[in-house]
Amino acid sequence: ITAIEIAAAKHPDGTPIVPEVCIFFENELMRGNRTTKINAENFNAFRSFNYPPLAKAGIHIRYNEHLIRRPDPSRPMKPHYLFDTNVVVLTLFPGIQESIINSVLHVPGLKAVVLKTFGSGNAPQKEWFIRQLKEASERGIVIVNITQCQSGAVEMGRYETGLQLLQAGV
C-alpha cells in the first residue's frame, strides 16, 4: 500500500512529489538507477549504496525533497529505446589471463568496455594489460573504469595502477 501512496502523492499544485523511477522496498524509496539487488532470498534485497533514500516510510512517509529530481518543463522527456549492445562489462580478478583480455578487446564491433576494477580504480600492473587497453583505446573503443566495491568511487590518480589506466586512455 505504501508504494501506491508514494506513486499517487502530489504537491498542492498537482505535480507528483516523486516524479522519477524508483524502487520502494523495506520502507525505503530508492532512486531506480542507483539501486542494486543485493540478496535473492531476504527481504532486505535492494540497496542504494551511493545515494541516500528519497523517502522513508513508517507511520508517516518522510520525503527527502532536496534529493528528489524535478523535471525541467522546458525540456520534454526523451526516452531512449535503442541501446548499443556492443558494450561489454569486464570484471577484473586476480590472475586474469592475457588471452581473456585479448578476446574481449577484439570482439568484432566492440564500442565500449566497462572495466570493473579493484578498490578505488586499481587493476593489474602487467605490461600486456596496459598495452592492450591502450591499443583498444587507440582503436576508438571507449573504456570506463568503475569500482567493484558496493560503495565509494574510482579515483584514477590516487595510486600508480590507476594512473597507468588513465595514461592508457581509460
Task: Give residue ranges: language-model regions.
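Accessory alpha-helical/coil subdomains and C-terminal extensions
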Residues: 22, 28-120, 125
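A glycine- and small-aliphatic-rich helix-loop capping segment at beta-alpha/alpha-beta transitions
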Residues: 2-10, 36-45, 162-167
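C-terminal non-catalytic interaction/assembly regions of soluble proteins
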Residues: 120-170
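Short, surface-exposed, charge-dense and proline/glycine-enriched linear segments
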Residues: 9-19, 45-56, 144-153
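Short, glycine-/small-residue-rich phosphate/pyrophosphate-handling segment
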Residues: 1-27, 31-34, 170
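Alpha-helical scaffold segments in soluble metabolic enzymes
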Residues: 2-6, 28, 53, 103, ...
